[in-house]
Amino acid sequence: MVLQKNWQSLIKPEKLEVEPGGEPLRTATVVAEPLERGFGMTLGNAIRRVLLSSLQGAAVTAIQIDGVLHEFSSVAGVREDVTDIVLNVKQLALRMHGEGPKRMVLTATGPGEVRAGQIQTGHDIEVMNPDLVICTLDEGVKFGMEFTVNLGKGYVPAAANRPEDAPIGLIPVDAIYSPVRRVSYKVEPTRVGQVTDYDRLLLTVETNGAVTPEDAVALAARILQDQLQLFINFDEPRPVRTEEPQDDLPFNRNLLRKVDELELSVRSANCLKNDNIVYIGDLVQKTEQEMLRTPNFGRKSLNEIKEVLTSMGLSLGMNVPAWPPENIEDLAKRLDEPF
C-alpha cells in the first residue's frame, strides 16, 4: 500500500482539450490539466523533444530527372537549376500507407509552373501540399522526373540515401522525415477546488498535415510510455477481489455500503455528508477534481479516501451504469458482513 502511494497520491490530468489553430489539421494547442506542480514542465519538455525527434514520417530520398546526370546541372527550358529543384522537393509533405520504398512519377509540358499536385503518386502516397511549386517550364518544354519515397524518422543526409549500386543520374536528397514542424509549450497555474498550485500544460504543435497535432501528441506520449516501461522493476499489487452477492448485481457489492462504514476522519466524513454522498456507490462516481471542489475538502482527505477505496478494489471516477438500484435500501440491509 505504501508503494502505491507514490503514484496514487498524485493528482492525474482529467481534462484534455484541443484548441484548433488557423489550419485545424496542421496547427492546434493541446491543453492538459490539472497536473502536479512541476509536472507541466517535466511532461511538456519530454513530449516536445519526442515530437521533434521520434515520430515516423515519409520523405523523398532520391530523384532522377530526364537528361540530368548530377545535381549541378541545368535543364534546357527549365528556369530553375537542379539544385533549386532539389530544394523544392525537400519541402514536399507526404503521407505514406504501408512500407517503403515507393516510387512517384512527374511528367509535364510547358509553359507554366509544375506543382506537387501533378505528381502521380499511386494509392499508397498522398501529397499534403499540392500547391508546392517544383519548377517552371518554358513554352513547349517536356519535363520528366521520378521520386523515391521512404519511411523514417528525424533527419537523414543525402549521402546516407545514396545506395551502393546507385545508377548514373540518381540524385540523393536530404530526407526530413518528421511530420512535426514546430512545437512549443508553456505552463500556467490552475486550481482545483481550494488548491491553486497545480499546473496547466499547453502544447502548441504544427505539423505538415500528414498527422494531426492531436494524434502527434498521442504518438509521442505512447513512445514515452513504451520507453519508461523498462524502469518499472516491481509488480503492482492486484486489487482485493470481493465476492458478489447472491442477488447477481452488475456491480461490486461494496458499493451498497454507506460511507459511514469507511471509518474516515471526522473532517472527511463531514465533507461527504455535506455533499450528500450516502453510499460508496455515490462516492466512486466522483472524480478527483469534483472531490477537491467540495468545501473544506483537501488533499489529505482525498488521499485517505483513495487509499480506503483501493483496499476494496474500487477507485474514484468509476462508471457504474446500473447505479443506483431501485431497491437500494433493501439490498443494503442484507449486507451485514463486516469489512
From Swiss-Prot:
Taxonomic superkingdom: Bacteria
Its EC number(s): 2.7.7.6
Pfam families referenced in this protein's UniProt entry, alphabetically: RNA_pol_A_bac, RNA_pol_A_CTD, RNA_pol_L
Keyword Nucleotidyltransferase: yes
Catalyzed reactions per annotation: RNA(n) + a ribonucleoside 5'-triphosphate = RNA(n+1) + diphosphate
GO cellular component, one term: cytoplasm
Gene Ontology MF terms: DNA binding; DNA-directed RNA polymerase activity; protein dimerization activity
Region (Alpha N-terminal domain (alpha-NTD)): 1-235
GO BP term, pick one: DNA-templated transcription
Enzyme class: transferase
Keywords for this protein: DNA-directed RNA polymerase, Nucleotidyltransferase, Transcription, Transferase
Residue ranges of the region described as Alpha C-terminal domain (alpha-CTD): 251-339
Family to which the UniProt record says this protein belongs: Belongs to the RNA polymerase alpha chain family.
Domain comment, as recorded: The N-terminal domain is essential for RNAP assembly and basal transcription, whereas the C-terminal domain is involved in interaction with transcriptional regulators and with upstream promoter elements.
Record NCBIfam families: PRK05182.1-2, PRK05182.2-5, rpoA
Subunit structure: Homodimer. The RNAP catalytic core consists of 2 alpha, 1 beta, 1 beta' and 1 omega subunit. When a sigma factor is associated with the core the holoenzyme is formed, which can initiate transcription.
Role of this protein: DNA-dependent RNA polymerase catalyzes the transcription of DNA into RNA using the four ribonucleoside triphosphates as substrates.
Name of this protein: DNA-directed RNA polymerase subunit alpha
Organism (species): Gluconacetobacter diazotrophicus (strain ATCC 49037 / DSM 5601 / CCUG 37298 / CIP 103539 / LMG 7603 / PAl5)
